[in-house]
A protein has these predicted regions:
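Extracytoplasmic ligand-binding site segments that recognize negatively charged/polar headgroups
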Residues: 129-142, 181-197
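Alpha-helical, coiled-coil/dimerization segments enriched in small aliphatic residues
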Residues: 70-72, 190-218
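Structured C-terminal subdomain patch of bacterial secreted/periplasmic proteins
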Residues: 137-145, 152-159, 165-171, 233, ...
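Short helix-initiation/N-cap motifs at beta->coil->alpha
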Residues: 30, 84-95, 214-223
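Bacterial Sec-exported substrate-binding components of ABC uptake systems
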Residues: 15-51, 150-181
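Sec-dependent N-terminal signal peptides
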Residues: 4-13
Length: 287
């Protein structure tokens, strides 16, 4: 019962935070940027998650150009590759923005440094920075409004919400409580905190994040701490592309339950780190 109460409290707390939301006929992001809540016909998007949502709800016709990724692809791969580019997702070309004459620019938090420059050019801009699962659900609704695909977006939000609810219920029935971490890097060994999107995924999967007791947005996990916590698993993301990188990072890894049971693996960052509906599909696989 206590576990259920804590879970409900956590979910309610999550709904109090927001990345971008609809309020009083306006779309507002957490950085104070505001635009009218309506359909936009020429959108530049540099957030891969928003691009994926747009394609899923049939709103891709509103995209005039995107910020391209350098490593992981954006789904649906073949269709996205055909879109025009205004630079990378972290370094856009302002001249290209002017060339495409957008009526809205949607950027991720990686583009915060460019927001004011875009505004000075006279363009509307919103930051779509979802740091937890509930914020992704809200983002789906917002994307539906700006693309004129509100009904389709609400259908997608409902399906995603049901998947999340099912996962929560199933994890509540489990008696075991796994401990682990999703690693950001190995030199030093850093992990995603509870306040990150991967950290929120772990919470909803009923996993204890061993990084939760270490301060910082990217907590550093010392060899002594890892040995003491003795995680059941260690997963890698971002620049990590091989379990061997984690195993060779410290001689204590082999002494943990994760090492002994060979429960060290790599997650697909394009699924775990994006503000996309696809993260709920991945959670169904991981549960």
């Amino acid at each position: 019962m206590k576990k259920l109460i804590l879970l409900i409290s956590f979910i309610l707390f999550s709904f109090t935070s927001f990345a971008v939301k609809i309020e009083n006929n306006e779309i507002v992001d957490k950085y104070g940027n505001k635009i009218e809540a309506r359909e936009y016909k020429r959108i530049i998007v540099t957030d891969p998650g928003v691009i994926e949502i747009l394609f899923k709800i049939g709103g891709e016709k509103s995209i005039v150009a995107i910020g391209k990724t350098t490593k992981s692809k954006i789904y649906p791969y073949e269709k996205v590759e055909k879109l025009q580019s205004i630079g990378s997702i972290s370094n856009l070309n302002l001249e290209k923005i002017v060339e495409y004459k957008p009526d809205l620019v949607v950027v991720s938090s990686m583009m915060l440094k460019n927001v004011e420059s875009i505004k000075k050019l006279g363009y509307k801009v919103i930051v779509s920075n979802a740091s937890n699962l509930n914020e992704i659900l809200e983002l789906i609704s917002v994307v539906g409004v700006i693309s004129g695909r509100k009904n389709e977006a609400e259908d997608l939000r409902k399906v995603s919400s049901l998947k999340l609810e099912k996962i929560i219920k199933e994890n509540h029935k489990k008696s075991s409580n796994l401990k682990g971490a999703i690693l950001f890097s190995t030199s030093p060994m850093t992990a995603f905190s509870d306040d990150s999107l991967p950290g929120d995924v772990l919470k909803h999967l009923g996993v204890t994040n061993i990084a939760s007791n270490v301060p910082g947005q990217r907590p550093i996990l010392s060899p002594e701490y890892i040995l003491k916590e003795n995680p059941d698993f260690l997963a890698g993301a971002m620049s990590l592309d091989s379990p061997q990188q984690i195993i060779e990072a410290s001689n204590v890894i082999a002494k943990t339950k994760a090492g002994k049971n060979k429960n060290i693996f790599i997650l697909d960052s394009s699924l775990m780190l994006r503000s996309s509906y696809r993260i709920f599909d991945e959670m169904e696989v991981l549960k």
